[in-house]
């Protein structure tokens, strides 16, 4: 059993022994546990922090001297960072914890379910903040991408993206039967969305049918909002439609997550 599972079980026993904690204390305890588990997982740290830099280096070399293309790629990588830290991470982790019985044990403790998910989401938000800082700094200092012209819009769309993709990640975890099949399920959603949503290319260059499909994808609307704030200095109002789309996807994710989420391991 992995160190992360053992850490979760120790935390679960501590919660049970200490009686019902306050909601805030329980959420904070879960957040700290998630941070410890994250930093003890080198693979997670690599994909969260080094991979965006590698992508920036790759596309910076490919699009060297083509500033318009770099202005497209940097917000796209920022959007991918949000999705990877929330949707992908939660879908993987919740499936793993459910399969090993950790979620069922946590459900039997005095810790409220909302406190648990708040701690988990808070950890994902911390990763997003660090990733965006890395992408923005590298994009500005190394590749000459302009600094965000509207920081408020950047914060709003980043927060909307975190909430949206976190809810969708929790919802997807219910559909995944076991941790072995998690990569197939996650990549079946992530890879097509990444290719269609215009993350690495100007969407105007795509065929009309792909542009139509992209219009319904949450990643496309997140990248549009981030691009408006980071590259064009546009406020939230300029991309109100994208913010609404993220809100609608959040509602879908929350409904599916609440109605379908299971704390119990699947039967073989």
Question: Which stretches of residues belong to each language-model region?
Answer:
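Aromatic- and glycine-rich beta-strand/loop motifs that create alpha-glucan
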Residues: 2-51
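Residues that define the loop-to-transmembrane-helix transition and helix capping
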Residues: 42-43, 71, 114, 152, ...
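Hydrophobic alpha-helical transmembrane segments of multi-pass membrane transport proteins
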Residues: 54-61, 70-142, 160, 169-170
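Alpha-helical transmembrane segments and their short interhelical loops
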Residues: 113-187, 191, 236-247, 251-257
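Membrane-interfacial helix-loop-helix junctions in multi-pass membrane proteins
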Residues: 65-66, 146, 197-252
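Hydrophobic alpha-helical transmembrane segments of multi-pass membrane transport/permease proteins
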Residues: 37-66, 70-89, 188-195, 248-251
């Amino acid at each position: 059993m992995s160190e992360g599972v053992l850490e979760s079980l120790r935390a679960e026993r501590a919660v049970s022994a200490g009686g019902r904690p306050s909601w805030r204390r329980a959420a904070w305890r879960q957040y700290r546990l998630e941070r410890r588990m994250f930093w003890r997982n080198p693979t997670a740290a690599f994909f969260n922090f080094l991979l965006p830099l590698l992508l920036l280096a790759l596309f910076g070399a490919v699009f060297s001297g083509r500033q318009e293309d770099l202005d497209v790629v940097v917000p796209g990588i920022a959007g991918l960072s949000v999705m990877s830290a929330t949707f992908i991470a939660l879908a993987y982790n919740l499936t793993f914890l459910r399969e090993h019985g950790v979620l069922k044990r946590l459900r039997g403790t005095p810790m409220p379910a909302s406190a648990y998910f708040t701690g988990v989401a808070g950890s994902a938000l911390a990763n997003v903040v660090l990733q965006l800082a890395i992408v923005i700094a590298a994009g500005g200092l190394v590749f000459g991408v302009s600094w965000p012209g509207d920081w408020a819009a950047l914060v709003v769309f980043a927060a909307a993206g975190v909430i949206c993709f976190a809810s969708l990640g929790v919802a997807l975890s219910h559909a995944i039967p076991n941790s072995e099949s998690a990569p197939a399920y996650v990549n079946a959603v992530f890879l097509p969305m990444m290719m269609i949503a215009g993350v690495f290319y100007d969407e105007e260059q795509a065929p009309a049918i792909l542009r139509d499909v992209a219009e319904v994808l949450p990643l496309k609307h997140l990248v549009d909002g981030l691009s408006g704030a980071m590259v064009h200095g546009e406020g939230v109002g300029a991309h109100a439609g994208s913010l609404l789309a993220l809100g609608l996807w959040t509602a879908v994710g929350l409904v599916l997550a609440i109605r379908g989420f299971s704390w119990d391991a699947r039967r073989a």
